[in-house]
Amino acid sequence: YTDVDGVYTTDPRLLPEARKVSQISYDEMLELASLGAGVLHSRSVEFAKRYNVPIHVRHSFSDQTGTRVAADPETSNQAVGGAALIKNEALVTVKGVPDRPGTSLAIFSEIAQEHITVDMIIQNVGADGRANISFTVLDDDLATTRGAIERALVELGSGHIESSTDVAKISVVGLGMAEQTGVADRMFRTLASAGINILMITTSEIKISVLVDREQAQEALRTIHAAFELDKAPTTTVLSETERRRDS
C-alpha cells in the first residue's frame, strides 16, 4: 500500500490525461523506477521478479483497484507501456580531448571517484586527432563533475568543458519494443512534427530516451504520450501465468 492508487502511464501531476494501468511487467516497472517513478523502490521489484511474486500497488485509504506488477505487461500488442520525464538533467561536453586509447578512462574514472552516476554518453571524433565527449549527469552533480573533468584534462594535456542545465530527458518504456518495429521512428517523427530538436539518444531493449531542451520538455512528453495512445485502455490484456494455467 502507498499514497498513490496505482502505476500510471506517466506522472499524472505532469499530464492529467495519464492513465492508471491494470498491470505492468517487472522489467517495465524497474525501468520506470530508474527514471524517477517513486511508486515502488527498485529493490522491492527486483526481489519480486526473482521469486515471481506479484505486487499489487494500491492506495492505503481506498478500495479502488490498483496496479498489478507481474511478469507480463498490460497487453501484448502495445509496444510502449509508459513514458517518463526527468527535468533535473545537465549536459556536459568535453571538447578537444586527444582521440586516443585511455581518454575516456581518464575522464570517467575521475568522475567515478566522486560517486557520480553518468547517464547518456556520446563520443564524436573531431578534427586534428581530437574528440568531443558528451554525457549527462544530475543537476546537483554538475559542479563536482566539472571539477573531476578538470583534473582529467590536466593529465590529458588538452580539452575544455561546456555544460548546460537547460535540458531534460524524455523516455518511453515497453516490453513490446523487443518484438515490434517502428517505435523509434514514431517517437522521432512525433518530436520533429512538434518542432522539438533531439540533442542525444540512448536505447536499450525496452527503453528509448532522448534529451531535449528543458523548455520543450512538457510538450515533448504530451505529444509522445498521445502518439503512443497511452491515454487509451488496451482492447486486449495479457493473462498472467496463473490465469493461463487456470483457464487451460
Language-model region placement:
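C-terminal catalytic "cap/lid" subdomain
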Residues: 1-248
